[in-house]
Swiss-Prot record:
Residue stretches spanning the membrane: none
Pathway connected to this protein: Cofactor biosynthesis; thiamine diphosphate biosynthesis; thiamine phosphate from 4-amino-2-methyl-5-diphosphomethylpyrimidine and 4-methyl-5-(2-phosphoethyl)-thiazole: step 1/1
Presence of the UniProt keyword Metal-binding in the record: yes
Cofactor binding annotation: Binds 1 Mg(2+) ion per subunit.
Domain of life assignment: Archaea
Keywords: Magnesium, Metal-binding, Thiamine biosynthesis, Transferase
KW Transferase (keyword) present: yes
An example Gene Ontology CC term for this record: cytoplasm
Catalytic activity entry: 2-[(2R,5Z)-2-carboxy-4-methylthiazol-5(2H)-ylidene]ethyl phosphate + 4-amino-2-methyl-5-(diphosphooxymethyl)pyrimidine + 2 H(+) = thiamine phosphate + CO2 + diphosphate; 2-(2-carboxy-4-methylthiazol-5-yl)ethyl phosphate + 4-amino-2-methyl-5-(diphosphooxymethyl)pyrimidine + 2 H(+) = thiamine phosphate + CO2 + diphosphate; 4-methyl-5-(2-phosphooxyethyl)-thiazole + 4-amino-2-methyl-5-(diphosphooxymethyl)pyrimidine + H(+) = thiamine phosphate + diphosphate
Gene Ontology terms describing biological process: thiamine biosynthetic process; thiamine diphosphate biosynthetic process
Protein name (record): Thiamine-phosphate synthase
Length: 211
């Protein structure tokens, strides 16, 4: 589990909605997705457990890390590599009582929150949103310049998320980050695999300082 790299193109899912859900996830991974997170705010726990177990298997087949959003119990029961938590979720200490895998933490636009997360054992932090996003309509929008300082505050992987697409992704050129997370930029695309491939190329350029 821990040898899987926390780096690159990070896909966060929509809520589960049927068989096509898995097809799109597989297409996205084959297009270049490096990390997968299952986020589902509407389905019953029994459905989410079934879906999370299926995604655990898919991610394992492709050798990529798989995270469950919000719920350490679900992550444990599904056999996921990690859980991702935000400000409305239990703190890292409580998560550790339930789940012993990787922990990703949303740190929004707060460098102190990122530092605290690292000290408590977070595996990575995720800053954002930096742009408007329809996926989380109540998400705050933060100043991208916070990324100029982020690497001085934390040594663990830094991801960015929120309203990122082929146009806005170029705004991250020149910043020291480890990966970029998207939802609609891939899953709402007409050709999911092609969208993932195009984003992956941009992500690789950014995290390797080629832009």
């Amino acid at each position: 589990m821990n040898e899987k790299k926390l780096r690159g193109l990070y896909l966060v899912t929509y809520d589960y909605y049927g068989a096509e859900f898995y097809e799109k996830i597989i297409d996205a991974i084959e297009g270049g997705v490096d990390i997968l997170q299952y986020r589902d705010k509407t389905n019953a726990y029994s459905v989410k457990l079934q879906v999370a177990r299926k995604l655990t298997s898919i991610a394992a087949d492709y050798g990529i890390p798989f995270f469950v959003d919000d719920d350490p119990k679900l992550a444990k029961e599904a056999g996921a590599d990690g859980v991702h938590i935000g400000r409305d979720d239990p703190p890292i200490e409580q998560v550790r009582d339930v789940f012993n895998g990787l922990i990703g933490v949303s740190t929004y636009g707060n460098l102190e929150l990122a530092t605290e997360a690292e000290k408590k054992g977070a595996s990575y932090v995720a800053f954002g949103s930096f742009f408007h996003t329809d996926t989380k309509k109540d998400a705050g929008i933060y100043d991208i310049k916070i990324l100029e300082k982020a690497r001085h505050f934390v040594k663990i992987p830094i991801f960015v998320i929120g309203g990122i697409n082929l146009e806005t992704i170029t705004k991250f050129c020149g910043y020291s980050i480890d990966g970029i997370a998207v939802v609609s930029a891939i899953l709402a695309a007409e050709n999911v695999k092609k969208a993932a491939k195009e984003l992956k190329e941009k992500v690789e350029d950014i995290i390797n300082g080629r832009c």
